């Protein structure tokens, strides 16, 4: 860009008249520096260019370097400057004050500011509100500010005003005396803890305020109390040796490296974990920090993860997400309240707290994974009054540097949100079925005890689709937060290593490290756990965490990578014997005076099923009480894994992992509405083992029976594709017998689907009284009280009928697709090439009728569920497999295709377009283009390169093969 064009550009923004320009400035330099960027480097360069163009004499060197570096920073960075930038500015000011005369360029800039009459002068506010400071947004300093009013946020100024520099000796002495009066003991090695001294060091203010601020002064008493609270929390369970602390502190040499480890807890930064001193990193507000400080009082159980938040100044984050393996047998390892940390000499607590470890150090998050033998000792500390859902207590220390506390509660709400007011149906496309009760998690006083890894995975799943402002502005925020939550989840889960935590092993654990000559101690395996029928909540939580990870990855473009997580979930579920019913509870002795018929007991505590767990084989037995809710969680988790195993066997062309034989005696999941209401006594009749009939509106009610039938078809297909025995099997009578049996199961499901529709539509339409009783009897706790109060009985009946018709449409579509899979070919290339002339056989005609029926059901689905939001995770593969025959007809017959087939093709295209909007996947976008191309040929729009079009379609479809060595959708 030439000088003339630059001058012309700057002149268009002039807020001044020519009469107000200072002498020696060009006509083009009428730009108020406040207009473009006050004190920006660009504006100074324009002044320099204009001065040279007019031949004005200037001081050699221009603006002094310190001043230039200080005024070249954006205003947001000035407002939230750190201590180094403050010192830099002070040096620049000193150097500028010692100059013999002011630079002409600075005088011109000052004159422009003084002569500005374009409007009110933009002033720096003394401090931003907590929300704007956290979101790195410009704040006007009002209460409430304009930004909080616009986005409906809570505007408050609760952050502590901090003072630059070191604390005075008087404050240090007061803090030390307060700590001594509090009874803080010295460390185990005899040295006084350095945390009490280092915690008094002052940290950089988040909003750059000076010592004397507009609305208040620095209060040493408040600062001393804050130092006391910080120092009190800094007394760790086991300290590292002094050499380790020296090594950690020695790694921080410059102001632009990591801060010292003695800092107060309020230096936790939230965003931009790539650099250590990023000025765009917001900070947590004081209420959030105080609530975290209250998590672990002195009398709390040290087993709880909530007490593991150290008071170091944490100015870093995840940089590479690497998790290295740590030797589990090390005796001397740094720990925080018995949490084993990596053996790094540089900031050992960093990986545990979601901070980035050094690139060369092992970053393994060695947290105690909940194991079958030790999770009963987990206890919740007293929760903060500001925490809406106390269930989040175990994960709060880990997510403090990632998301605000309020957003974590909102994400938990999103996880349990149902899009249907009549029947429970997860709104998130990544929640394929509810394993847990909503009320158990969201209970205000007695929530379910959960592992931190499970909670982190639930927040991660909800963050994928949440519309919270924290995740949508800027656009990169969601990806950054989700990446940190994913790394945290993996770190807390400790994949494939599920052993007892330090201090919670049995006395004979060390003796059982070697079992039958094989050393298994490093894998967390001991005789205490071998053969144990464990139902500990922590073990179930680990399996559910694997399910969350695998589901989201399966829905992405990295489908092949998801199998490692699904395999881990299936393997751990099999080890925990989730496919078996637990033994009944031992009878509990009745206390004296206790009535025989207690009608006030909690529904979830009725018929308590206590687990008898063998310990060490011959060492007797331990009786553990397992509630009916925990039993139902085990059942639902197994059946969810059972269904996804069969679903993914079709998606990825792989054999089954979980067998029907493993769950022959396992009860079917109870009704979702009764489950959420905790009415375990209402689930009287329960079927056992895999079933083939539709029983309800949920995934377990109508989709699980279809997956049972699909498992039979997958086994048949795998036998058919066997390289040695497949040809013999296809020509034997056993093949025909199995095909007839599977056809009978599909007919049974079709009949049960009709009965299900009649039961939930005709009976509801008979009368308002019966319908209202039916709706009220469903215990819809997932519907908000306002929604229940404002909706009428008639509208709820209509919603229930529509939901029932939608479920029937989905069930009908998948049933027709299973008929196609049973009779036809799975691979699209083999289907289009048709070497065996299957297109002229009777089985092709029967399969084509089912393909058209599936398309008609898809039209009903689009009517009742236009966005395909009911089950987008499962629906895609059945829509694809049901469309291959229609593509074959359009490709082979072209203009001779019947109108019903043309309508079916159009419906398939619309359904794929809706699926892409809800859950965008590459194979659906690809097949939509292929079907569009074939449909255009059917309608007579023949391209000139017809042969090339057909060849291109085959090349695209060749990516997804269901042959013997094909991997289906797993590219």
UniProtKB/Swiss-Prot annotation:
This is Xylanolytic transcriptional activator xlnR. The lineage of its organism: Eukaryota, Fungi, Dikarya, Ascomycota, Pezizomycotina. Pfam families: Fungal_trans (PF04082), Zn_clus (PF00172). Residues 129-155 bind DNA. It is found in: Nucleus. Residues 1-25, 55-123, 182-263, 295-316, 580-610 are annotated as: Disordered. GO terms for cellular component: nucleus. PANTHER family: XYLANOLYTIC TRANSCRIPTIONAL ACTIVATOR XLNR-RELATED. Keywords: Activator, DNA-binding, Metal-binding, Nucleus, Transcription, Transcription regulation, Zinc. Transcriptional activator of the xylanolytic system. Involved in the regulation of extracellular cellulolytic and xylanolytic genes and in the regulation of the intracellular activities of D-xylose catabolic genes in the pentose catabolic pathway (PCP) in response to the presence of D-xylose. Binds to the DNA sequence 5'-GGNTAAA-3'. Residues 9-18 have a biased composition (Low complexity). Induction: Expressed in presence of xylose. Residues 67-96, 182-199, 227-241, 249-260 have a biased composition (Polar residues). One of its GO terms (molecular function) is DNA binding. Disulfide bonds: none annotated. The keyword Calcium does not apply. PROSITE patterns: ZN2_CY6_FUNGAL_2. One of its GO terms (biological process) is DNA-templated transcription. Belongs to the xlnR/xlr1 family. The gene is xlnR. It comes from Aspergillus oryzae (strain ATCC 42149 / RIB 40).
């Amino acid at each position: 860009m030439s000088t003339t064009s630059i001058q012309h550009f700057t002149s268009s923004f002039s807020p001044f008249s020519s009469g107000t320009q200072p002498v020696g400035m060009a006509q083009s330099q009428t730009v108020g520096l406040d207009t473009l960027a006050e004190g920006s480097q660009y504006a100074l360069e324009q002044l320099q260019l204009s001065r040279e163009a007019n031949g004005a004499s200037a001081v050699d060197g221009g603006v002094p370097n310190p001043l230039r570096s200080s005024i070249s920073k954006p205003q947001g960075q000035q407002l939230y400057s750190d201590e180094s930038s403050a010192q830099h500015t002070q040096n620049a000011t000193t150097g500028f004050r010692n100059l013999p005369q002011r630079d002409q360029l600075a005088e011109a800039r000052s004159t422009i500011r003084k002569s500005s009459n374009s409007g009110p002068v933009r002033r720096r506010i003394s401090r931003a509100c907590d929300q704007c400071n956290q979101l790195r947004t410009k704040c006007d300093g009002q209460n409430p500010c304009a930004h909080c009013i616009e986005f409906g946020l809570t505007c408050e100024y609760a952050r502590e005003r901090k003072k630059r520099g070191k604390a005075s000796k008087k404050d240090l002495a007061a803090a030390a005396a307060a700590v001594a009066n509090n009874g803080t003991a010295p460390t185990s090695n005899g040295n006084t803890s350095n945390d009490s001294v280092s915690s008094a060091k002052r940290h950089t203010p988040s909003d750059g305020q000076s010592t004397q601020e507009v609305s208040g002064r620095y209060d040493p008493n408040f600062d001393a109390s804050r130092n006391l609270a910080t120092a009190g929390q800094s007394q760790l369970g086991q300290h590292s040796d002094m050499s380790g602390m020296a090594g950690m502190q020695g790694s921080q040499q410059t102001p632009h490296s990591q801060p010292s480890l003695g800092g107060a807890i309020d230096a936790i930064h939230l965003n931009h974990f790539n650099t250590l001193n990023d000025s765009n990193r917001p900070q947590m507000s004081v209420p959030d920090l105080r609530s975290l400080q209250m998590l672990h009082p002195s009398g709390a159980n040290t087993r709880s993860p909530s007490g593991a938040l150290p008071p170091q100044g944490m100015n870093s984050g995840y940089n590479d997400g690497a998790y290295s393996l740590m030797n589990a047998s090390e005796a001397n390892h740094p720990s925080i309240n018995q949490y084993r940390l990596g053996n790094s000499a540089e900031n050992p607590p960093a990986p545990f707290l979601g901070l980035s470890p050094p690139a060369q150090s092992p970053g393994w998050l060695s947290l105690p994974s909940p194991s079958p033998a030790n999770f009963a000792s987990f206890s919740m500390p007293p929760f903060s009054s500001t925490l809406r859902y106390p269930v989040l207590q175990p994960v709060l220390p880990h997510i403090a540097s990632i998301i605000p506390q309020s957003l974590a509660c909102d994400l938990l709400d999103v996880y349990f949100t149902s899009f249907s007011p009549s029947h429970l149906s997860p709104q998130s496309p990544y929640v394929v079925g509810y394993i847990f009760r909503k009320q158990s998690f969201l209970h205000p006083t007695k929530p379910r005890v959960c592992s931190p890894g499970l909670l982190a995975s639930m927040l991660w799943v909800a963050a994928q689709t949440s519309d919270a402002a924290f995740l949508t502005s800027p656009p990169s925020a969601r990806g950054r937060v989700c990446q940190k939550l994913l790394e945290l989840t993996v770190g807390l889960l400790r994949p494939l290593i599920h052993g007892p935590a330090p201090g919670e092993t049995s006395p004979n654990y060390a003796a059982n490290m070697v079992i039958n000559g094989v050393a298994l101690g490093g894998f967390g395996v001991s005789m205490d756990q071998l053969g144990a029928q464990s139902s500990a909540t922590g073990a179930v939580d680990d399996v559910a965490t694997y399910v969350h990870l695998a589901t989201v990855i399966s829905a992405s473009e990295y489908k092949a990578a998801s199998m490692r997580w699904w395999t881990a979930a299936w393997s751990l579920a099999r080890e925990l014997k989730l496919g078996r019913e637990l033994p009944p509870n031992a009878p509990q002795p009745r206390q004296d005076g206790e009535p025989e018929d207690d009608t006030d007991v909690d529904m979830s505590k009725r018929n308590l099923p206590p687990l008898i767990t063998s310990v060490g084989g011959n060492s007797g037995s331990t009786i553990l009480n397992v509630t009916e809710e925990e039993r139902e969680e085990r059942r639902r988790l197994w059946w969810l894994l059972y269904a996804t195993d069969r679903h993914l066997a079709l998606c990825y062309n792989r054999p089954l992992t979980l067998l029907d034989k493993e769950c022959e005696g396992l009860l079917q999941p109870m009704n979702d509405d009764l489950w959420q209401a905790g009415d375990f006594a209402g689930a009287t009749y329960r079927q056992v083992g895999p079933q083939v009939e539709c029983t309800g509106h949920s995934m377990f009610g109508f989709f699980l029976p279809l997956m049972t039938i699909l498992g039979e078809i997958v086994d048949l297909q795998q036998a058919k594709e066997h390289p040695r025995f497949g040809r013999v099997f296809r020509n034997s009578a056993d093949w025909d017998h199995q095909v007839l049996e599977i056809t009978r199961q599909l007919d049974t499901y079709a009949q049960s689907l009709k009965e299900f529709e009649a039961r939930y539509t005709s009976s509801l339409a008979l009368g308002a009284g019966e319908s209202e009783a039916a709706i009220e009897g469903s215990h819809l706790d997932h519907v908000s009280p306002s929604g229940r109060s404002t909706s009428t009985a008639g509208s709820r009946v209509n919603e229930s009928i529509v939901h029932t018709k939608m479920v029937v449409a989905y069930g009908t579509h998948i049933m027709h697709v299973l008929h196609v899979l049973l009779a036809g070919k799975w691979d699209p290339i083999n289907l289009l090439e048709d070497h065996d002339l299957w297109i002229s056989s009777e089985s092709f005609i029967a399969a084509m009728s089912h393909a058209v029926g599936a398309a008609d059901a898809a039209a009903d689905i689009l009517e009742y569920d236009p966005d395909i939001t009911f089950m987008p995770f499962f629906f895609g593969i059945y829509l694809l497999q049901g469309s291959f025959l229609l593509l074959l007809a359009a490709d082979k017959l072209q203009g001779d295709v019947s109108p019903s087939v043309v309508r079916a093709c159009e419906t398939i295209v619309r359904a794929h377009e809706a699926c892409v909007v809800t859950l965008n996947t590459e194979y659906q976008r690809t097949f939509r283009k292929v079907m569009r191309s074939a449909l255009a040929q059917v309608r007579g729009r023949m391209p000139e390169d017809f042969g090339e079009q057909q060849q291109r379609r085959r090349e695209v479809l060749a990516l997804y093969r269901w042959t013997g060595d094909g991997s289906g959708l797993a590219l």
